[in-house]
Amino acid sequence: MSKTVRTFIAIEIPKTVISKIRELQDAIKASGFKIRWVRAENIHLTLKFLGDIEESKIVEIAEAVSKTAEEHSPISLKAKGIGVFPGIKRPRVLWVGLAGQLEALVKLQTTLDENLIVLDFPREKRPFKGHLTMGRIKDRIDVKKLGDALIAFRRFESETFTAGRIILYKSELTPSGAVYTKLVSVSLG
């Protein structure tokens, strides 16, 4: 039986933007919410979660990533605003939104999806909504207080950055959190 690895495809976020998001995390932490925070170095823009795949498929996936990257130019984005999925009544994920060339980002993700279908990865069922996960909410939370925090930090904004690379990551789940390793990194354009 072939060895499997847990994988996803994402855009790496520059350290300057990560630093701003870390400041935002710290400000929200000060409000005392019970949130399992994503370590700053693990914040990324997921394009496609692949899950557990056979190691033997990595080369084919890398080719699909390369093909996708060739078809798209770098994208200008910024982190902007915050919110929760699926909604304020039952929040599970606390995220930072994006602004900028969002149409180009959706086209990039759609192309990636199409290039992976031939490798038996199903198309995403939900429409793509680019975001940066900051934390996961596991327990009940005071939704009024959370709503107030979302309003208080709604004007959060980073500087503009260029999303210029697509990366295939391996994700290892450990007791202290996920550890991400770059397997393939390809420039857009």
What do the predicted segments below correspond to?
Residues 1-189:
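Histidine-dependent nucleotide/RNA phosphoesterase domain, centered on the 2H-phosphoesterase fold
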